[in-house]
Amino acid sequence: MTHPDRANVNPGSPPLRETLSQLRLRELLLEVQDRIEQIVEGRDRLDGLIDAILAITSGLKLDATLRAIVHTAAELVDARYGALGVRGYDHRLVEFVYEGIDEETRHLIGSLPEGRGVLGALIEEPKPIRLDDISRHPASVGFPLHHPPMRTFLGVPVRIRDEVFGNLYLTEKADGQPFSDDDEVLVQALAAAAGIAVDNARLFEESRTREAWIEATRDIGTQMLAGADPAMVFRLIAEEALTLMAGAATLVAVPLDDEAPACEVDDLVIVEVAGEISPAVKQMTVAVSGTSIGGVFHDRTPRRFDRLDLAVDGPVEPGPALVLPLRAADTVAGVLVALRSADEQPFSDKQLDMMAAFADQAALAWRLATAQRQMREVEILTDRDRIARDLHDHVIQRLFAVGLTLQGAAPRARVPAVRESIYSSIDDLQEIIQEIRSAIFDLHAGPSRATGLRHRLDKVIDQLAIPALHTTVQYTGPLSVVDTVLANHAEAVLREAVSNAVRHANATSLAINVSVEDDVRVEVVDDGVGISGDITESGLRNLRQRADDAGGEFTVENMPTGGTLLRWSAPLR
């Protein structure tokens, strides 16, 4: 018997139950397809994250690592612009690595971000920030002129253990959509790997720098053990420090009187410079009171500065600086200054500690060289005294005996010519004895000869320099080895140079440096109007002749910044 309802169903149409089953199957297939697409997309993004992590951890150079982090982060989330801001010790941005902005636009924008606005919010509170419209954030301060428009934003801190190294900034997702939760998770994972990569790169650079520091210290020590003059130490310190820090310039300032106690030093003089700095800075004086350099010298404490209160000329504008005392036992030999250009980041704590240790080791080498020089001088003086005693006790006495014998024999000579020859020989013996006595006197006067030269030069300055002319004098090296002839030359050179500065240059300051190494050097720098050709040919001809007579060199030139630089040198005899 057929059911009445079933009899009314159209035999050609599918049953209702079958239709519903097909609909559910279609929905299930679509859901499965979506899930598969999500799985594939997730796998692709995970593969992209792994590739990004491998890319940023493959190198050990810090600059290259920072750029790799920015590039891979932008690629990972399809961001048009990316940047990494490095935080300094005072939470300011000290370095800003960017991608997506061409150099022409970068030049039009001007200075790099300093950490204001939304960037500053991430610096003050280092946690992820994701914005659909950056302009709507309460901390937003807008963009500078010529800056490309940016709307979507994703910022994530980069940490090295408990330290926030910097922040990773990404803007303008390529499809115009806002950054998603998945984007944030991926960038956070990348930032974690970036912290490890940066830490490894920093450790590698620190190890290389420490190796260079050890090598530089060894080089200085080797030079000192080889008998280098203490004046050479400061030149080595400046050159090695410049190489270590890869900075713009270095300089060394020491007391005007290296024998005065540190508490009695009022001024320091810059005796050595290296790098991109004007040679005119050499011999510049720096007051101990009221200056950064003087404060470090007085306190014997290494310090760093964002900008040094010292006007120095050079091709680059000086910026961050390290000021390091050259400490040796209970003395301070001077101050070492390392300068970076104004557009470079400040020095770090680790760099300060490392360079302070280098300065201490260098000062110890200077102390060793000074002690060796003093010991050599004592040995020389001891030998002089011994030779003088031998000459007096043996040679002169024997010559006297010979002379007395000849005096007794002369009257008995019958031939007049022989008698005259004997008397002539007696006179020669008297002259020889007198010359030996003079030599003995010079040998005994050896310790005071340096003092005599210094006294003679100081006397010249006192006689010729006028009160309105600010004059500084620096003596370096063993003046005790300068003989009388060279001392006379040095006095004449200084007299002529100071006289010209007073009479012709209209100078207000005069810097004098007298040094003794393998030769005697006299340098005189003034800030006057320069020297004309006629004065050079007439008034300075004598100095050129003195240099020729002594086998040395003489130059005089106008400096680009104004004033005159006079150099005279002659080899030691």
Swiss-Prot record:
Gene3D superfamilies, per database record: 1.20.5.1930, 3.30.450.40, Histidine kinase-like ATPase, C-terminal domain (3.30.565.10)
Known catalysed reaction(s)? ATP + protein L-histidine = ADP + protein N-phospho-L-histidine
Q: Which GO terms describe its biological process?
A: detection of hypoxia
A GO molecular function assigned to this protein is: ATP binding
**Secretion signal span:** none
Can you list the GO cellular component terms from the UniProt entry? cytoplasm; plasma membrane
Task: Give the location in the cell.
Answer: Cytoplasm
Q: State the protein's name.
A: Oxygen sensor histidine kinase response regulator DosT
Q: Which organism is it from?
A: Mycobacterium tuberculosis (strain ATCC 25618 / H37Rv)
